[in-house]
């Protein structure tokens, strides 16, 4: 068995694609589901072993159901400060904590939010 993707809903597909590109991902492909009135965009990292499926439902005005149950995505980064600054300057929302050590774990973490408010954890391991 292999874990292949996680799906998150978006209200602005283009903004979501731009955000995940800032994290080094690329758009693998899009699928138009006309019967469901939805567009799916699959964003993959360079290793291509996992995807984030961005789900855009056309014409939906009310909040998506189930959104409050999601925790966060996590990325391992080489330089936390550089990545955090690039994302914030690119429009990511600062949430949770700014770059700081995680007590007793030998790593530093920070959180930002994507255009739809999903939290993204950035992790830098320290030797």
Predicted regions and their residues:
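Core segments of cupin and vicinal oxygen chelate
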Residues: 1, 8-49, 103
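Short histidine-centered beta-strand/loop micro-motifs
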Residues: 31-32, 63-66
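Helix N-cap motif at beta-to-alpha junctions
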Residues: 12-13, 78-81
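Eukaryotic phosphotyrosine signaling hubs
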Residues: 3-5, 68-73
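Vicinal oxygen chelate
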Residues: 30-32, 39-43, 74-75, 84-127
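Short, charged/polar surface micro-motifs in flexible loops or helix N-caps
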Residues: 47-50, 60-61, 80-81
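Short, solvent-exposed aromatic-acidic interface loops
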Residues: 58-60, 127
């Amino acid at each position: 068995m292999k874990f292949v993707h996680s799906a998150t809903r978006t209200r602005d597909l283009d903004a979501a694609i731009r955000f995940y590109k800032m994290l080094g991902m690329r758009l693998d492909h899009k699928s138009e589901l006309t019967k469901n009135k939805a567009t799916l965009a699959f964003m993959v990292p360079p290793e291509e072993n996992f995807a984030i499926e961005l789900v855009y439902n056309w014409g939906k005005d009310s909040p998506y159901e189930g959104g409050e149950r999601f925790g966060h995505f996590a990325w391992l980064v080489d330089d936390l400060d550089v990545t955090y600054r690039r994302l914030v300057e690119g429009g990511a929302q600062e949430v949770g904590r700014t770059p700081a050590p995680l007590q007793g774990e030998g790593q530093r973490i920070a959180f930002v939010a994507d255009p739809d408010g999903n939290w993204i954890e950035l992790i830098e391991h320290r030797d």
